[in-house]
Design a protein with these regions (language model features):
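Short, small/acidic-rich helices and loops at N termini and domain boundaries
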Residues: 1-76, 261
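Glycine-biased, small-residue-rich flexible motifs in mid-sequence functional cores and linkers
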Residues: 5, 64-276
Length: 276
């Protein structure tokens, strides 16, 4: 995980065939296929800080051999050619209940309108009231309001946040208290990026595929045509997950839709009304 930049389709497939130890030995020796070597950074990374953090209990490293590994999500990502994670750094509930209880991803615009913020919070609370977890990347706007809506349900709300950085980085910085409240309330923070990894745009897009894969359904509350949230919808659709789009004002740029979200808008309206 230290030597690669997700998504790593070739390295993941190679490790699945040979096992991680033998795969690493072959990569070190330079005898792995060119596609695998192209996904590996040089020189070999220093793992001492990672091992110290694991020993101290600051985080948990989940691997495909663990009972808590999200097998369905990893399998679907690998089968679709999207790239399954090699492992997951986790902070929060050690039982990872939210990973196995079919979360609903609620995502959307960072610059949400008051309408979008209200609907996101209502969805978060309504889903949490049914003992279903909310999943997203804890971004500003729609995502943060959905998480806060879930947390407002008398401690019942559980959240799964997929980070585009190391588990110890705390990004967005303004959401430090929110992330701590999530882990204190039985939720989890998950990332495929090692400790200390800084966020950047490409990692944000790579993260979206995990949000989609770990969720049973995705709801787009508001999103412009270039919104990163639409990457979640497209991946979810590609993986065969349900995708919904909340109808919004036709005059609003954050209620723009593409073909992926447009065909699901009526379903989202029906789902939204029935969940109230």
């Amino acid at each position: 995980m230290r030597a690669t930049e997700p998504p790593t389709q070739s390295v993941g497939a190679y490790a699945a065939v040979h096992g991680p130890v033998e795969a690493a030995d072959r990569i070190r020796a330079g005898c792995a296929p060119p596609a695998v070597l192209a996904e590996v950074a040089q020189p070999e990374p220093d793992l001492r800080d990672d091992l110290a953090a694991l020993e101290a209990g600051h985080a948990r490293l989940l691997t495909p051999e663990d009972d808590d590994w999200p097998n369905a999500a990893a399998h679907d990502l690998a089968a679709s050619g999207t790239g399954a994670p090699l492992g997951l750094w986790v902070c929060g509930d050690p039982q990872l209940g939210v990973l196995t209880a079919g979360p609903v991803a609620v995502v959307g615009s960072l610059a949400a309108s008051p309408y979008g913020e209200y609907v996101a919070a209502e969805l978060g609370q309504g889903v949490a009231d049914r003992d279903i977890a909310i999943a997203n990347g804890a971004g500003f706007g729609v995502e943060a309001h959905a998480l806060r809506g879930a947390l407002s349900t008398s401690g019942r709300g559980r959240c799964l946040v997929v980070l585009a950085c190391g588990i110890d980085v705390g990004y967005p910085a303004d959401h430090g208290p929110l992330l701590r409240e999530i882990t204190d309330s039985g939720g989890v923070l998950v990332t495929e990026y090692p400790l200390g990894t800084k966020p950047r745009r490409t990692r944000g897009y790579a993260r979206q595929r995990l949000v989609a894969a770990l969720s049973e359904a995705t709801v787009i509350v508001e999103a412009g045509r270039r919104s990163p949230a639409l990457a979640v919808a497209r991946t979810a659709s590609r993986l065969g997950r349900r995708v919904y789009a909340v109808p919004g004002p036709v005059t609003s740029a954050t209620s723009a839709v593409d073909r992926t979200t447009e065909r699901h808008a009526d379903q989202a309206y029906t789902w939204l009304i029935s969940s109230r």
